[in-house]
Design a protein with these regions (language model features):
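C-terminal substrate-binding subdomain of Rossmann-fold SDR/epimerase-dehydratase oxidoreductases
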Residues: 1-122
Length: 122
């Protein structure tokens, strides 16, 4: 299975950039043919993802390396609703605010591991 992991700083950057460029209302909005991007209360939805899916076992390996610990792995069959792979399409975000998350998984996990070590769970 593959998943698309995104570092938190990239998510924050994407959200902040969107706050700086909100959708604007359209005086010609037609409620019979609604377009949420130009409604009286306009909004836009964006995927904020890294767009680089990684095998879950590779993710676990990188996390183990970053934390200096081996995970206890328990393999389960796919659950109803699971998909084999996911990846974010950030093209709309890039077009709207000129931003694409870019923190490599390895770096994000190293930073996460440092944070976990600084703020351990009880």
């Amino acid at each position: 299975m593959c998943r698309d992991f995104t570092y938190i700083d990239d998510i924050v950057e994407g959200v902040v950039r969107c706050l700086d460029k909100p959708a604007t209302p359209d005086a010609a909005f037609d409620p019979l043919a609604p377009n949420p991007a130009t409604a009286a209360a306009p909004h836009r939805l964006f995927n904020i993802g890294n767009s680089q899916p990684v095998e879950l076992l590779r993710f676990i390996e990188l996390l183990e390396n970053a934390l200096g610990r081996e995970a206890i792995k328990r393999f389960e069959p796919m659950q109803p609703g699971d998909v084999v792979a996911t990846a974010a399409d950030t093209s709309a975000l890039e077009a709207w605010v000129g931003f694409r998350p870019c923190t490599p998984l390895e770096l994000g996990l190293e930073r996460f591991a440092a944070w976990v070590k600084d703020y351990p769970f009880p």
